[in-house]
Regions:
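N-terminal BTB/POZ boundary and linker segment
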Residues: 2-63, 97, 101-116
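Signature of small Cys/His-rich zinc-finger-like modules used by ubiquitin/SUMO E3 ligases
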Residues: 7, 161, 182, 186, ...
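Acidic, low-complexity intrinsically disordered termini and linkers
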Residues: 5, 234-281
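Post-BTB helical module
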Residues: 101-203, 210, 231, 235-239
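Alpha-helical oligomerization interface recognition
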Residues: 44, 48-85, 99-104, 132-139, ...
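Charge-dense polyanion-binding interfaces
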Residues: 81-98, 156-160, 243
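Eukaryote-biased feature marking scaffold/signaling PDZ-domain proteins and nuclear chromatin regulators
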Residues: 44-46, 53-55, 60, 67, ...
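Hydrophobic, mid-to-C-terminal alpha-helical segments
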Residues: 217-229, 235
């Protein structure tokens, strides 16, 4: 059977922007309160709790927090936490800036913040279980996926998947799949592939949709990852089984692949012989 071939990149790549100006992003999709309620909140009137995040205090209303956040609903309704529930202190993956945006979202159904805080807001929405904000943040991040952030977004999505919600769409999984598709299309341009996980690199290299300029480029990326992460030999060989050595030039096989120290083992040479055998059979 002929070896499978990957898609090839075109000779021109997407332009990259060097603009470092701060951009404000607006997320919407929530339910806005009547203007009078928002006015009372902004003036700090009739609040009955204080939420502390990273040393900052946010005057709030328990009813509003509990009605929009499953986390706070559980927190304030838990009798065993009654003593400490009055004025909660948030820890974990919630920054003060992200909570400020989330708090506004609960009242106004939308929030605006520095675009660089997008992943923080997504983490906060996921942790505090504010599903409409999480949905909006995932959609915004998907629109901004690029070779420079695809792997980081994929990793973030995998981390967020630890908080499943069976009643709703699996938003972290949706983000992970979109990030994977971006990585497949832009494999040659990916930033810091050596920071990826073994599972991610395995999924990319094994996928026929992976677009690369050559199989030599695929091997080089795998080699950078392996040299950085030093996986166990069995894991490395399992990963390399998805590299299509028969599509490489003889000179690259001889000068680069065969001389790569991480393949200079009995098992490594055995795998290489096995993988290039179809070429000479």
């Amino acid at each position: 059977m002929a070896p499978r071939k990957r898609a090839r990149t075109s000779s021109t790549g997407g332009a990259s922007s060097s603009d470092t100006s701060v951009t404000t992003i607006k997320l919407s999709g929530g339910e806005s309160c009547p203007s009078g309620v928002v006015e009372l909140w902004r003036s700090g009137q009739l609040t009955d709790t204080v939420v502390t995040v990273e040393g900052r205090s946010f005057a709030a209303v328990k009813f509003m927090l509990a009605s929009g956040s499953d986390y706070f609903r559980c927190h304030f309704n838990n009798e065993q936490m009654a003593v400490g529930a009055a004025n909660p202190t948030l820890q974990g993956p919630v920054s003060a800036a992200a909570f400020e945006a989330l708090h506004s979202f609960l009242y106004e159904g939308e929030c605006s913040f520095d675009e660089t805080r997008l992943t923080e807001v997504l983490q906060a929405a996921n942790y505090l279980q504010v599903k409409p904000l999480e949905r909006a943040a995932v959609a915004a991040l998907k629109e901004r996926l690029s070779p420079s952030n695809a792997l980081a977004a994929w990793t973030l999505a995998d981390q967020l998947s630890g908080t499943p919600d069976l009643a709703e769409e699996p938003l972290p999984e949706e983000l992970a799949e979109a990030a994977k598709e971006t990585a497949l299309k832009c494999f040659d341009e990916l930033d810091l592939v050596e920071h990826a996980t073994l599972k991610q690199v395995q999924a990319l290299v094994a996928d026929d949709r992976l677009t690369a300029k050559s199989e030599e480029a695929v091997f080089s990326a795998v080699a950078r990852f392996a040299e950085a992460k030093q996986p166990a030999e069995a894991e490395l060989l399992g990963l390399l089984r998805n590299v299509r050595f028969v599509q490489m030039s003889p000179s690259f096989l001889h000068d680069t692949v065969r001389s790569w120290p991480m393949l200079d083992t009995r098992a490594g040479q055995g795998l290489l012989f096995e993988m290039v055998a179809p070429r000479v059979s």
